[in-house]
Amino acid sequence: MNNMTSISKQNGGVHIAPPTQYPNPAHCSILPGMDTLNPQQRHKNMSCIRSKDTSLEKAIRKALHKEGFRYRICDKRYPGKPDIILPHYYAVIFINGCFWHAHEGCRYFVFPKSNQSFWQKKFQRNKARDAENLKYYQEQCWRVCIVWECAIRGKNKNQKIERTKDRIIQWLDEEWDPYLEIKGD
């Protein structure tokens, strides 16, 4: 038994006395920022994360549809399976999660503390794939819009969705820039 707790049997049960001193964080098995789940629990959590039809995608699609825009979604015929495809405008929209696409400088992207070599490779592959997709669409003279999660997430979500929708519509109707990136504040 360490000096942190004392155990005594009282009335046939177990009584755990409060610690006489608080633990030193350097000696804790769980430090802030470390994974507290076992591999099976982590696998279950990660497998429940959706890769399409996320709430952000649905919100942007709903806002565009309400304005009369018609589109395709996650069509496998298009490289990278863009979240929204607007063939009439030769435009594709990717709605990127800040964590999964390693959005540098974003408050929603925090590099994981556990299994760092895996995550380093994963983020490098994701970024390389994103760059390949962007290059492909630019070579095919399609326009590409990247909407980052941080542009919509947080307080005043409905206002942020409206602002993002308005910016996309302006880009589609009035501008012919080949690339648009919408980031959070």
Each PLM stretch: what is its role?
Residues M1-Q10:
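Extreme N-terminal basic, low-complexity initiation segments
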Residues G12, I16-A17:
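Short hydrophobic alpha-helical segments enriched in small aliphatic residues
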Residues P23-P25:
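Short hydrophobic targeting helices and cationic amphipathic motifs
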Residues H27-I146, A151-D185:
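Nucleic-acid endo/exonuclease domains
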